[in-house]
Amino acid sequence: MIWKRSAVLRFYSVCGLLLQGSQGQFPLTQNVTVVEGGTAILTCRVDQNDNTSLQWSNPAQQTLYFDDKKALRDNRIELVRASWHELSISVSDVSLSDEGQYTCSLFTMPVKTSKAYLTVLGVPEKPQISGFSSPVMEGDLMQLTCKTSGSKPAADIRWFKNDKEIKDVKYLKEEDANRKTFTVSSTLDFRVDRSDDGVAVICRVDHESLNATPQVAMQVLEIHYTPSVKIIPSTPFPQEGQALTLTCESKGKPLPEPVLWTKDGAELPDPDRMVVSGRELNILFLNKTDNGTYRCEATNTIGQSSAEYVLIVHDVPNTLLPTTIIPSLTTAPVTTSVTITTSPSTSASSSSRRDPNSLAGQNGPDHALIGGIVAVVVFVTLCSIFLLGRYLARHKGTYLTNEAKGAEDAPDADTAIINAEGSQVNAEEKKEYFI
């Protein structure tokens, strides 16, 4: 009896030690998310382990690894690390069917387990845009649909036009036949105009499996519209005698045919002076008969449009020459006897010292006009000098004052003055008396 009692005590003591040691042993795992087709790594750790075995099993409770021994024949499952404190395995080429709850077991008494959930993300397929048929007429209502399949969870679709997001769209989500992935579609409705021609409409698919790199589909719009026409003159102030070019700018899709020019609702009246070259109308040597309304008309398969230009030919402005005022020459009574001589060469030389170039640069770059003005001024100056010389020559002679006239030696004085002249003849005829 004593031996049996001691054996029982030993057994309970061993069990107590085992239970006490196992209280610090517990497997630790983490949930894993992986993209379909990727590789998932499942890790189970034990901080305190007294050589107790670890095991991984799949959602179907099939053992994958028991310590370092592979239990399931699946080439996709490999051992990463096996020790008393860790058991890690990898599952490559993960599919949607691999998703579920995996179990790590620590074989203590009792057995302790930890769960790790494997989430598999379904990658959405490249989106496709439908509903566009080229070409589209200006003003038509367009409906575009963007669709993508195979996403898990359901993907998000966004629309952009000219890099600006469009919010007013319709969104539809449908579950695929495998009941695991989704097909998502979005519809965009808008009315087009000519500004939409050549614009890229983008459908963008956002999903957590794409690693911040969204998938996109693009549709470039082709819009047909009637031409728009504008006439641009080569000068804003056409004058008589000048040339004028009228350019007809026309934009449309399809491209407009060659433009048609008319004047006042009829054909151009003077084809020799009014030459049409492409989209330009060239009018040579404008005159008053060219006044009128010119019309440019452009046509394509969608329609036609026109623009008008009213031509008014202005007169050439007259250039006024500067006038020169010649002062009148008057004589005043002289109270002393004076002999006056003239030297035309001296006056001419003093006048010729004027620099004609000083007049240049005052009235713009018309050198011919400036030269004419200078010539007129010089001519008038020379004429004035000539007339002044003739006047002084005719009045040259000997003059006596009243005092000289009553003096006794007046004849001698006259003779002295006459002799001083030397070259004068008939001095008596040159005498003048003032009373």
Swiss-Prot record:
GO cellular component: axon; plasma membrane; synapse
Processing and modification events after translation: Glycosylation at Asn-51 reduces adhesive binding.
Pfam families with a match to the protein in the record: C2-set_2, Ig_3, V-set
UniProt-listed InterPro entries: CD80_C2-set, Ig-like_dom, Ig-like_dom_sf, Ig-like_fold, Ig_sub, Ig_sub2, Ig_V-set, Neurexin-like
CDD domains per record: IgI_2_Necl-3, IgV_1_Necl-3
Keyword Aminoacyl-tRNA synthetase: no
GO annotation (BP), single: cell adhesion
Residues in compartment: Cytoplasmic: 389-435
Function field: Adhesion molecule that engages in homo- and heterophilic interactions with the other nectin-like family members, leading to cell aggregation. Important for synapse organization, providing regulated trans-synaptic adhesion. Preferentially binds to oligodendrocytes.
Family: Belongs to the nectin family.
Protein name: Cell adhesion molecule 2
Gene this protein is translated from: Cadm2
